[in-house]
Amino acid sequence: FVPEGAGVRVAPFSMPLRPTALSRAVSPHPFVPDDAALRRKRAELLLSIQAHGLRKRLLHTGSRAALLPVTDDLDSVLALLVCARTMDLLGRARHDVLAVTQPGGDRARVLRLCKALGVSVRPNADRAGLARTHAALPLAAPDFTALLLGEAVCAPEAYGVNAAVPRTLVRWLIAAEAERAEEPLRAELRAALSAPDADCAGISCALTDFCFYHLVRCGAHPRRILRLARAAFGDAAADADILRAMAALTRCLFRRPAALPDHVALGSSAQALHWPPDAAGSLWGEEIDALRRELT
């Protein structure tokens, strides 16, 4: 602010604000590289990090086996792939992976995948007893997005194989592994990806990952995220859906502490949340409410 006087002339004016289109493309899946070659390279790197992280935990705890509860969802598929890689790194037999099938879902598909990978299968059983008998490390398969939103929980003693993997990235990691796999594993992975219930990254999860990325990686506020999401998703996501995803993310980040299991960190988006339990999200909530009022 410059006061009048002292040779200063103030000339008030006004001009209309016009919305301008973004001059760059915005990806709806910021965790997934757009370039196919880079995507394959990144997938190999992330899978390798996951496997080496699990290898370190097995060696550190002196575990002779890995105990993984599995269903027919893509989180379980990815966790099985990581476990198989880990045993290869350790020079151990893949039978040291104890896959415990859970009730529900397509159990036959789970059994075929386990057979193709060469891992041991146990029916729904006493996991604590199995862990003691085989000196096995308890594992958990839920991805980062499910844990962040509270859709899944892990036992305190479990190691989260996918706890740093956003849900929108799970499918691409499995697809990259399917490209390099041989039969019959390739067929089983493609069957898992094409299953009717395999769309684990619907629009709501894609919006959650999108909002989280731009909040943590870029420090964007709700109004900016809304504009970016409009450009990224177009007609696939209404403004109300975007604001709903931001509100859910706000509740999860600020109103309850994140309960993530032990896991290896991936990427540079601070997905391994060390979120202060007394953090307040009032500014975010107020801006989201203001945006809702503007749109009504």
Regions found by a protein language model. Name each.
Residues 1-72, 76-296:
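ATP/NTP-dependent adenylation/nucleotidyl-transfer catalytic domains that generate, transfer
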